[in-house]
């Protein structure tokens, strides 16, 4: 006998099953996860370099996830940031990169210093990882190397621009260099000396160095200050040491210019040197009020609300995650295949969300410096510290 009630019940159960299946599939699609790693320094005197990276990545990831994630190919992904503090130790950097490989991470931001960036290269190349160091040795970015992408402006790009500006606009003629006795700052010192000499400047100090844990810089700076340079370059100086060096130089009576090619933290300068830091020149974040888009302004606002403060360096550090994601959007096969990512870099172009204007683009650069495109394209913003904040000195570009 035809049982209408049974048919209705069966149909209802079928509908529920189909709905459950659709919900499960939708949930599965929504739950796709794209892990992006960070291996760098978030403790010690250089902590602000890596902390700026992590905070920038997390704020941007949370923002993208808030709007449903990112669509790459046919799938939508939520971004998960996986972090590792290498404590500025190359051995720990290697361990961090190995951890990323174990977790299936193919794209890593960092490390922040030369030793770490060089140390992780074999792991990155053997495990199929593209990494974005904030360190300057050219051998990381020139052929046959191909897995590292410079995430900022290099000292050998910004240094000559700073020295030329000071020579032409401030009458600087004599330059002295001082650096921590570590490979990263020493390398930057050597590049700076070469650039200064190429500009016809007189270099009066080329070998002065200090241990990175030094806290009294008076003995180090006394013989330099006595030579009365027009410009004192703090090569590769860590943010925690910069105010100590500045304070010591000023208290010794030095009245000339002080600069560095590394990014700094305005709050650290204010707390450690106060008004004595006024006039200190450094490479700022890749934004100024004049060029910042509404997206950049909102990023700063979200960052400040999340952490109670903002680091100007994050104007640069915000870029890495977008470069990774936007390159994958152009070639979805790059999600788990870094060779596909590399193929896309030469012709890659996408709107730059952080700079005003329709003609602002994200593109890879570095051909002049490295013979291949292994650097993210960002504005070169040189800043001058004044009364607790950085003010723009000039803006330039690299190719």
Positions of PLM-derived features:
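Extracytosolic ligand-binding ectodomains
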Residues: 2-10, 14, 29-399
């Amino acid at each position: 006998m035809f049982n209408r009630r049974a048919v209705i019940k069966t149909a209802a159960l079928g509908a529920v099953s189909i709905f459950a299946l659709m919900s499960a599939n939708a949930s599965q699609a929504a739950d796709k996860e794209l892990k992006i790693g960070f291996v760098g320094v978030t403790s010690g005197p250089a902590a602000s370099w890596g902390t700026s990276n992590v905070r920038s990545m997390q704020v941007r990831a949370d923002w993208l996830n808030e709007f449903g994630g990112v669509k790459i190919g046919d799938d939508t992904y939520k971004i998960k940031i996986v972090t590792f503090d290498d404590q500025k130790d190359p051995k720990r950097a290697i361990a961090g990169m190995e951890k990323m490989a174990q977790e299936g991470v193919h794209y890593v931001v960092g490390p922040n210093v030369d030793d770490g960036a060089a140390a992780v290269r074999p792991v990155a190349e053997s495990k199929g990882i593209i990494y974005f160091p904030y360190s300057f040795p050219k051998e990381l970015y020139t052929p046959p190397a191909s897995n590292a992408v410079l995430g900022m402006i290099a000292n050998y790009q910004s240094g000559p621009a700073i020295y030329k500006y000071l020579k032409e606009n401030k009458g600087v003629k004599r330059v002295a260099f001082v650096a921590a006795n570590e490979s990263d700052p020493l390398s930057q010192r050597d590049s700076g000396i070469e650039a200064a000499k190429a500009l016809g400047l007189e270099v009066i100090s080329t070998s002065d160095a200090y241990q990175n844990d030094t806290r009294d810089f008076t003995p180090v700076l006394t013989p330099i200050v006595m030579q009365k340079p027009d410009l004192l370059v703090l090569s590769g100086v860590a943010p925690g040491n910069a105010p100590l060096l500045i304070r010591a130089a000023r208290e010794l009576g030095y009245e000339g210019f002080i600069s560095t090619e590394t990014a700094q933290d305005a709050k650290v300068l204010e707390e450690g040197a106060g008004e004595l830091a006024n006039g200190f020149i450094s490479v700022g974040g890749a934004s100024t009020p004049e060029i910042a888009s509404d997206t950049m302004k909102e990023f700063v606002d979200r960052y400040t609300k999340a952490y109670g403060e903002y680091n100007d360096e994050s104007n640069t550090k915000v870029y890495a995650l977008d470069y990774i994601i936007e390159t994958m959007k152009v070639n979805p096969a790059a999600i788990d295949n870094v060779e596909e990512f590399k193929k896309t870099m030469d012709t890659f172009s996408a709107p730059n969300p952080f700079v005003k204007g329709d003609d602002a683009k994200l593109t890879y650069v570095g051909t002049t410096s490295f013979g291949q495109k292994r650097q993210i394209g960002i504005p070169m913003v040189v800043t001058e510290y004044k009364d607790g904040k950085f003010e723009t000195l000039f803006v330039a570009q690299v190719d």
